[in-house]
Amino acid sequence: MEEYLNPINIFSEIGRLKKVLLHRPGEELENLTPFIMKNFLFDDIPYLEVARQEHEVFASILKNNLVEIEYIEDLISEVLVSSVALENKFISQFILEAEIKTDFTINLLKDYFSSLTIDNMISKMISGVVTEELKNYTSSLDDLVNGANLFIIDPMPNVLFTRDPFASIGNGVTINKMFTKVRQRETIFAEYIFKYHPVYKENVPIWLNRWEEASLEGGDELVLNKGLLVIGISERTEAKSVEKLAISLFKNKTSFDTILAFQIPKNRSYMHLDTVFTQIDYSVFTSFTSDDMYFSIYVLTYNPSSSKIHIKKEKARIKDVLSFYLGRKIDIIKCAGGDLIHGAREQWNDGANVLAIAPGEIIAYSRNHVTNKLFEENGIKVHRIPSSELSRGRGGPRCMSMPLIREDI
C-alpha cells in the first residue's frame, strides 16, 4: 500500500478504500444464548462456523480490491506484547470495567489472564469467562444475593461491529462513549491502540474520548468531504455529543466547518444513521423511508470571531439540504425502491448499510436482492456477500468495518 503522511486519513465516505479495521468472528458468538442475547443487542444466535465463512468472503473481497486489513485483536496484541507492565495495566483496567467487585475474584482473573498467551488472553476477554474456567472460584455472598449468571466476564459479541467504538474523522478519531454498558468495554481496545501502538500513539488527534458524558457511536458518524460531516442523533447517539464534537473539530482548526445533524427516530430498527442512510457515489445516497422514518436536520457552523457555534434547523427536504451543502444535485436510491414490504424487510437486514470501497462501488449483503438490483440499475457496482448468520446481529458491511485510510477525492 502507498504511504500516507497520517495513519488515519478519512475525508469521505466513498474515496477508494486503502486500509480498514475488522474483527474476526470468534467464540463470543458461541456464548450467546436465547436467555441473554437481547441483553447483548442480538436478535438471534449466529452459527459461528458459517458466520466465519461469510466474514471471510467479506475480507476476501476487500483484499481482492487491494484493501489492507488490520484486525483489532492483532493491533491490541501488538500493543501489549511490547511491555509486561502495560499488559498488567490493561488486565487490571479490563477487570475493573467488567465490574468485578471482590478482591478474591479480581486476583483469580489476574492470574488467569496472565497465564495465557497475549493472543489467547485477548480472545478470552472478548469471548467471556465462565465460572468453570477459574480454578478455586467460589460464589461470593454478593454473587448469590444478586443472582450472578454463568459468566464471570461477559462476552463481547458486538466487537464484530468495528464501526462503532471509535470513528475515523479526517486525520483523527473519536473514541466513543457507547450508549449501552454492554459495549463500553470495547472502547478499551481503541484507547490502548491510540495511546500506545507505535503506528498510532503520536500521530492521531483524539477529537472526543471514551469517558464523555453523552454517548456517540460510529454508525452515526459520516464524513462527506473535507468540510462536511453528517452525524446522526439516534437511539445510540445523543445531541450533546454532536455539539461537543463540533466544538472539538472547530476549535482544533480542522478542515471541517459544517456539521449536519440528522435526527432519526429512536427505534431498534434504526439504531444508527447508517442503518437508514449511506453514501455510495459522488452524488448518490441510499436511504430508507417509511411512515415512521423521518429526518429532522440541524446545521452546526462555527464563528471564529465569537468562538461560538451557530445552530439552525433546516426546513428543506433531505435531498435539497444535501444538494445545497455538497454544491451539486444528488440522487437518493430508496431501500427496495420504497416498497412497503421489501423495503422494511431489506432495511431490517441492512439493505442500506453498505460499504463503499470506491466511488460507485459497494459491498452489500446478497439477501437484499431488490435493493441491490436497484443499485446496479443506477450504475453502482455491487459486490455481494452471504449473510444468513452475520445479519443476525443487525449490522451490515458498513457496521462491520472501520476505514482507516481512504484516497482523497
UniProtKB/Swiss-Prot annotation:
Pathway: Amino-acid degradation; L-arginine degradation via ADI pathway; carbamoyl phosphate from L-arginine: step 1/2. One of its GO terms (molecular function) is arginine deiminase activity. It comes from the Bacteria. Keywords: Arginine metabolism, Cytoplasm, Hydrolase. One of its GO terms (biological process) is arginine deiminase pathway. It is an enzyme of class 3 (hydrolase). The keyword Lyase does not apply. Its main location: cytoplasm. Its EC number is 3.5.3.6. It catalyses: L-arginine + H2O = L-citrulline + NH4(+). GO terms for cellular component: cytoplasm. The active site is at C399. Pfam families: ADI (PF02274). It is found in: Cytoplasm. InterPro entries: Arg_deiminase. Disulfide bonds: none annotated. Belongs to the arginine deiminase family. NCBIfam families: arcA, PRK01388.1. This is Arginine deiminase. It comes from Borreliella afzelii (Borrelia afzelii). The gene is arcA.
